[in-house]
Structures are given as C-alpha cells and as structure tokens.
Amino acid sequence: LGDFFLGTDYDYINEVLDKLNGRIHLVVGNHDTPSKITWYTSWNNIIEIADALRIKYKKREFFLCHYPVLTASLEQDPNRAVINLFGHTHSKEKFYEDRPYMYNVAADAHDNRPISIDTILNDFDEKVKECISFLGEE
C-alpha cells in the first residue's frame, strides 16, 4: 500500500510490472511522486490509483491507506469493524501499537514476502481474541 517503487529505475520497474499477474489497485504513498503516478497510469494492469480505498472480502470491510489509521475499537463487534491495512511504518510488527484493527501489510513485517488476505484475517482474529482475553483479565 503505497510506495510502489523507490527510486527511478524505470527499466527495472517495467521488468517487475511485466511479471505481475492480475489487476492492480494502487494506493499512493509518500514516495509515489507526481511523475511516478503519471507514469503508473500508462500501465494496463494498474486499473485504479487512489489515496485510499475501501474493499469487502468475506463480509469483512477493509480501509486501505498508506498510513496507519484507527478505524475501530475493541468495544465494537469484530465482525462489523473496519480493518485498516497500511504499509508506511517500515516496522517488523504486524499490528500498529498492538491494535488489532491496524494491520501492517508492508513486506518488512512479513519476511519481505506478500501475504494473503486470508492470512490477514487469521492474524486479525487471533489478535482480537488475545486483546479481549487481556481486557477480561483486568
């Protein structure tokens, strides 16, 4: 989410983009300069460029943004809460400040590998249970 590429080696970027499957919904980050964004629009597999997006998957709602954003609290029903997916922090932690509704999808937090949305939901469900259990012990 955001900072699609650092640097300006457009030949390398072309090489990587040619290998990607599917359609790309690009959320802009602080290193995605106006010239890069203009260049991204020339790619057929990038179908959308936005500052933020909302998506639904398996009846769960996600807010995609480059930056961590608080979208819910533990008082909400976890099945109805909006989960923020972000990348900006370059942290190795999956959750921002240990909050289950703020999930870091940056490669830094996942051994420099992409992760599936089902893995995110699994991690989220486990974190919510952990937080609720912790709050119940107080």
Cite the ranges covered by each PLM segment.
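Conserved beta-sheet core of the metallophosphoesterase superfamily
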Residues: 25, 42-137
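Core catalytic region of metal-dependent phosphoesterases/phosphodiesterases
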Residues: 1-57
